[in-house]
Amino acid sequence: MDSLDMQIIKNIEKEGRISHEELSKRLNLSRPAIHNRVTKLEEQGIITGYKATIDWSKLGFNTCAIISLRVRTTDYDNLLERLKNLIIPDLVIEECHIVTGTWCILMKVRCSTPLGLKAIQDDLHKIECIKESSTSLILSSLYD
């Protein structure tokens, strides 16, 4: 792994559909060299896939929030499975992380309006091991 590999990774992370030709122009390498490096990164499991970036606002999900949870459990797998299986109309759980610090779990959610957050709050408080929650609206993002 060298600095060129890292530049390839950063470009692909930002633009999953970038062509090898465009990468070769940006990095001043031949297309075969780019192809060989990308193939090697894929074979090593460093690049594991390519994904679409969704503009959630075009789907009507204009509100984005971070929900912090403090829980009382040692069975995080069971709790995460329950969170994964939550079905709430007009809500997308985009990310869910077990973290250290004051809170135990952080979730990034999207819905059409701030009032839509009430539905997930109501459902979360039905889960007995959730002790406390806090919701923060995301006003803007530097990186996404």
Pin down the residues of each PLM region.
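A compositional/biophysical signature of low hydrophobicity enriched in polar/charged and small residues
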Residues: M1-D144
